[in-house]
A protein has these predicted regions:
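Alpha-helical transmembrane segments
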Residues: 78-90
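Small-residue-rich segments of transmembrane alpha-helices in multi-pass membrane proteins
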Residues: 19-29, 57-61, 113-133, 157-165, ...
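Juxtamembrane boundary at the C-terminal end of a transmembrane helix
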Residues: 227-235
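Interfacial loop-to-transmembrane junctions
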Residues: 199-222
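Single conserved hydrophobic/aromatic residue that forms the stacking wall/gate
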Residues: 1-12
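Transmembrane helical segments that form the transport core of multi-pass membrane transport proteins
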Residues: 5, 104-177
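Membrane-interface capping segments at transmembrane-helix boundaries
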Residues: 96-106
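Membrane-interfacial helix-loop connectors
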Residues: 24-26, 32-42, 52-61, 69-74, ...
Length: 235
């Protein structure tokens, strides 16, 4: 029984660590993969899958803080309080959901098999790699031809993929685009991306998933807080 409980504990920790590490390179791909894996999850594991997704979102904010600091101290000084607050909120919501986990009885608990060689993970990574290239090109030409209006629109559209190329292209054009516009578009892209991540999580987890109420509640709180902070920024 002790070995079985220890095995379950390792499974739960593995999901959380996957979310934290995955958020350092792509929260969108990480959330999609976690949602796919969760289709075989028990009711007891549901909270940890969603907690791992929110930890990935939390790490995304920290990742962008580092990238922005590297490319533009001016933008960093105006945006870091918002990103830091949202990272803490996402982590806090994730930890709260993790703490709601129902511990299974030793007699009926079985650790989930870890299928780290799942080819679906490679397919998801490949799809997002292609989208990364597409949005890199789109962002470049939007900056050249479409102006501020095009940037605002693209900041929301870019959320359907990894928003890293969009934000990196913005940061590399600080000489031709106002700092306020870059900061606003970066925050809008992040909000859009979190909303899309929530829909990806719901879609890949499948209909009737045990994760659904936790996904809606957890991501809903994070998105609502993001919108409030964005309003404060515009005020």
């Amino acid at each position: 029984d002790r070995l079985r409980s220890r095995g379950l504990g390792d499974v739960y920790k593995r999901q959380l660590v996957s979310g934290i590490i995955g958020g350092l390179y792509s929260s969108t791909a990480t959330i999609s993969v976690l949602a796919r894996k969760s289709r075989k999850a028990s009711e007891q594991e549901a909270t940890d899958y969603v907690a791992a997704m929110l930890f990935a979102v939390s790490m995304m904010f920290l990742r962008f803080m580092i990238l922005i600091l590297i490319f533009s101290r001016e933008i960093f000084q105006s945006i870091y309080p918002y990103l830091l607050i949202m990272s803490v909120i996402a982590a806090a919501v994730g930890w709260f959901i993790h703490s709601r986990q129902k511990r299974p009885k030793d007699s009926d608990a079985e650790p989930e098999d870890d299928d780290s060689s799942n080819p679906l993970e490679f397919k998801v990574a490949l799809i997002f790699a292609v989208l990364f290239v597409i949005f890199t090109v789109l962002t470049h030409y939007t900056l050249v031809y479409a102006g501020t209006g095009g940037l605002n629109l693209l900041s929301f559209v870019s959320g359907f993929s990894d928003i890293t190329p969009f934000i990196l292209n913005l940061l590399q054009n600080t000489g031709s685009v106002a700092a306020l516009i870059i900061t606003a578009c970066s925050m809008q892209a992040i909000i859009s991306n979190i909303m899309v991540n929530m829909f990806y999580a719901l879609f890949f987890a499948g209909k009737g998933s045990k994760l659904r109420p936790w996904i809606l509640g957890g991501f809903g709180v994070v998105i609502a807080c993001n919108f409030v902070l964005l309003l404060f920024f515009y005020l």
